[in-house]
């Protein structure tokens, strides 16, 4: 039985970074088992926020590993992300994990994947999960055409995604750094 997480969006704007995640957790067969899950974690002395989409158990294993990499690199987000991606790609156990991580501090927003990719979006906005494309489009439109702060853009983008994607709900958690 695999539990799946759904949608995360991150927005960097005017020196602030916000991550938002919906609360829905479902089984692979479309059954909703939890509506108010928290898919965001504060890490490294509350200076880093991380969110996940994909397998819940896999994401927790990756959060733990990433937190260790942050400690080793004394909070250097990029270095910790590259080290996790390298381990994820080369370690026989980690390679089987199915999740995507979005991590952020005040300086950067990064996507880390199991293929060894560490991606920093050009515009400081990224979204993953089943409603990721909807949340990304909404966040970019809001960033271009409003003066809303990062936290409001992230929340509203996820709200919009929840109205379009059946695997994303409107029980939204937001964390800001």
UniProtKB/Swiss-Prot annotation:
Annotated InterPro entries: ATP-dep_Prtase_HsIV_su, Ntn_hydrolases_N, Proteasome_sua/b, Proteasome_suB-type
Family of the protein in this entry: Belongs to the peptidase T1B family. HslV subfamily.
Compartments reported by the entry: Cytoplasm
Protein name from the UniProt record: ATP-dependent protease subunit HslV
GO function term, MF aspect, one: metal ion binding
HAMAP family reported in the protein's UniProt record: HslV
Chain's gene name: hslV
Record text on activity regulation: Allosterically activated by HslU binding.
GO BP annotations, alphabetical order: proteolysis involved in protein catabolic process
Subunit structure: A double ring-shaped homohexamer of HslV is capped on each side by a ring-shaped HslU homohexamer. The assembly of the HslU/HslV complex is dependent on binding of ATP.
Entry's EC annotation: 3.4.25.2
UniProt-listed Pfam families: Proteasome (PF00227)
Binding site for Na(+): 162, 165, 168
Reactions accelerated catalytically: ATP-dependent cleavage of peptide bonds with broad specificity
Organism: Desulforudis audaxviator (strain MP104C)
Catalytic residues (positions): 6
Superkingdom of this protein's organism: Bacteria
UniProt entry keywords in alphabetical sequence: Allosteric enzyme, Cytoplasm, Hydrolase, Metal-binding, Protease, Sodium, Threonine protease
Main enzyme class: hydrolase
CC annotations in GO: HslUV protease complex; proteasome core complex
Function: Protease subunit of a proteasome-like degradation complex believed to be a general protein degrading machinery.
